[in-house]
């Protein structure tokens, strides 16, 4: 069994927080990109489209590696049932809280912004269900995927731990070349599965719950397991935290391929399958780029960094409806895309931080948006002298 390190790994906490917070410029730039979203500016910006594509190409792959790392750390700390309960509570409770408080009002707002409120009664029962699945899960999809992954890893982590007890983990050797081949094969395998589904029964791919629970889990699970393995094997972790010119160059070339596929690919052809192969290996290489960068610059304790590490989930949860509100009601009045982007950042981040500070002062909201029970300090119970 791998001992849990006594010292907190600050760079991983910081990277996870900043990856979460990158969702804010990602969604604001989406308004000004050439991609069709709920709300868009009158004219798209080439550079903001490029910025948006860059964030989208790797952010969640690296995020799930870090999630897998910390998840296995807790797996060794708690009994199995308690581990599952703690992990599911910490992601499931915020998700269930955000649906009625955030994504439901967001959905109602968009119905009127997009002029679809009148046509809602005419939709079939399935169309209403599927629309609600997409719109209510919305940006919370990764929390649902983490619940599914945690449940699957009750078995997967047990198998990993049992195999470790019967083998010498010090002899395990990893290289970026071997990992690249493995993840290339995983990307091709995912593409084959998606193409097979597309041929056999294409409507299921537009089903929101199937997309989140099956397809997204299937794609990101290798990264989650990779994170667990990085916790188990110090050599693998060192491989990611050591700067590699090869990984950086490969990631740059993969990003160019990603852009070309976005530009010239067709959804009716092989665009999505090609993208899955590219982003699978790109995500692996960016783990090295991001980890090595973070290990060099973010591996320290700071009150300011700790604040945003603690606030990142709440800020991410509330930023999405704020971004859509900004895009629907404020963006049309700002003619400059870059000025609108900067104003959007100030608007969303400013209000999100204010809401975060308010929710800290309300114990029920603090619990609901973190999934962590509020623990009273012993000093609070001591009688006054």
Curated annotation (Swiss-Prot):
Function: Necessary for the succinyl substitution of periplasmic glucans. Could catalyze the transfer of succinyl residues from the cytoplasmic side of the membrane to the nascent glucan backbones on the periplasmic side of the membrane.
Pathway(s): Glycan metabolism; osmoregulated periplasmic glucan (OPG) biosynthesis
Keywords: Acyltransferase, Cell membrane, Membrane, Transferase, Transmembrane, Transmembrane helix
Molecular function per GO: acyltransferase activity, transferring groups other than amino-acyl groups; transferase activity, transferring one-carbon groups
Keyword match Cell membrane: yes
UniProt xrefs under PANTHER family: BLR4337 PROTEIN, GLUCANS BIOSYNTHESIS PROTEIN C
Taxonomic source organism: Escherichia coli O81 (strain ED1a)
Membrane topology: Multi-pass membrane protein
Enzyme class: transferase
Superkingdom in the source lineage: Bacteria
Biological process according to GO: glucan biosynthetic process
Family, similarity comment: Belongs to the acyltransferase 3 family. OpgC subfamily.
GO annotation, cellular component aspect: plasma membrane
EC number: 2.1.-.-
Protein name: Glucans biosynthesis protein C
TM annotation in the entry: 17-37, 60-80, 91-111, 137-157, 173-193, 212-232, 245-262, 274-294, 311-331, 338-358
Subcellular location: Cell membrane
